[in-house]
């Protein structure tokens, strides 16, 4: 799957979890929108979620994920695993093309349609076409500065926007 037009980054530091997403929506080689909102709070404001991929598919997955959060009493780990199971086995859901990045104060997960629920080894994760750039910048800043999680997300997303042509610098940031 190729996900153009998206960079989503999450960083956790000092009890703060911050997620940022760029605002660019690209169709082929054309920028259709520059201020899309790809990051939001779910689960009564305790969970951050961002997406890479088809907007309509992501909205469906956000709805399903929020239902799983309610079903499992806000347990992010259980909700992520159960969504991944449904996504992989449901005939309609498995056609959806997106990746989800979800986080709360304790956990970060990347959820994919082929049943993967990936928990990163450290306190940062990213998805989308600019994800590798944002993640590399965030890891360097985590290891070599005392910046806050929010400052790291802002700087790393700016760097990704300078490198990835499918990422802009209209960044939406949410934190828990």
Curated annotation (Swiss-Prot):
Na(+) binds at residues 161, 164, 167. Gene3D superfamilies: Glutamine Phosphoribosylpyrophosphate, subunit 1, domain 1 (3.60.20.10). It is an enzyme of class 3 (hydrolase). Its main location: cytoplasm. The active site is at 6. GO terms for molecular function: metal ion binding; threonine-type endopeptidase activity. InterPro entries: ATP-dep_Prtase_HsIV_su, Ntn_hydrolases_N, Proteasome_sua/b, Proteasome_suB-type. It comes from the Bacteria. It catalyses: ATP-dependent cleavage of peptide bonds with broad specificity. GO terms for biological process: proteolysis involved in protein catabolic process. Its EC number is 3.4.25.2. GO terms for cellular component: cytoplasm; HslUV protease complex; proteasome core complex. Keywords: Allosteric enzyme, Cytoplasm, Hydrolase, Metal-binding, Protease, Sodium, Threonine protease. Residues 1-5 form a propeptide. Belongs to the peptidase T1B family. HslV subfamily. Protease subunit of a proteasome-like degradation complex believed to be a general protein degrading machinery. This is ATP-dependent protease subunit HslV. It comes from Thermotoga maritima (strain ATCC 43589 / DSM 3109 / JCM 10099 / NBRC 100826 / MSB8).
